[in-house]
């Protein structure tokens, strides 16, 4: 069974399951007629300076260095993946996260998951259920109309 899920999903796995045997991770499959390379869909953390200072700039600069990221990577169950090609993958807390991060590092295309940027009523509500409805047989128009109605209701 294939299931698309985020890097936090191993936290929900039962004890004793083995990577590569009971579960695995892979790139999103391409069309049979078109090679999409290694596409990755994900989220990300953005930082913004609201009050400029030397200390703030130094801290943000530090966050861009592999060492700061490797600290997060080492925390068991953090789900922290990093696109910085200078990181040491051995710093990850598990083989699972090393493998997940390798997928990210080898991506040829990265796209932000739009639902992460939507208001909760849409991203975790009508958009989510709409995608399930679409894969269960409802028409694209019917699903899109329902999602649009949700947007209209929160304006």
Model-derived features: where do they sit?
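Periplasmic-binding protein-like
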Residues: 52, 62-83
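Extracytoplasmic/periplasmic, Sec-exported soluble proteins
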Residues: 1, 5, 50-55, 119-123, ...
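Short arginine-rich
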Residues: 150-155
């Amino acid at each position: 069974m294939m299931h698309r899920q985020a890097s936090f999903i191993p936290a929900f796995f039962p004890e004793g399951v083995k990577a590569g045997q009971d579960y695995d991770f892979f790139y999103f499959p391409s069309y049979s007629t078109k090679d999409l390379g290694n596409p990755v869909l994900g989220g990300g953390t953005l930082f913004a300076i609201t009050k400029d200072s030397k200390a703030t700039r130094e801290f943000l600069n530090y966050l861009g260095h592999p060492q700061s990221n490797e600290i997060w990577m080492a925390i068991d169950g953090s789900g922290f993946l990093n696109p910085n090609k200078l990181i040491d993958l051995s710093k990850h807390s598990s083989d699972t996260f090393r493998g997940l991060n390798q997928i990210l590092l080898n991506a040829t295309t990265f796209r932000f998951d739009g639902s992460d940027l939507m208001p909760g009523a849409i991203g975790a509500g009508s958009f989510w259920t709409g995608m399930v409805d679409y894969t269960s047989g409802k028409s694209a128009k019917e699903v899109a109309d329902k999602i649009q109605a949700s947007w209209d209701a929160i304006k």
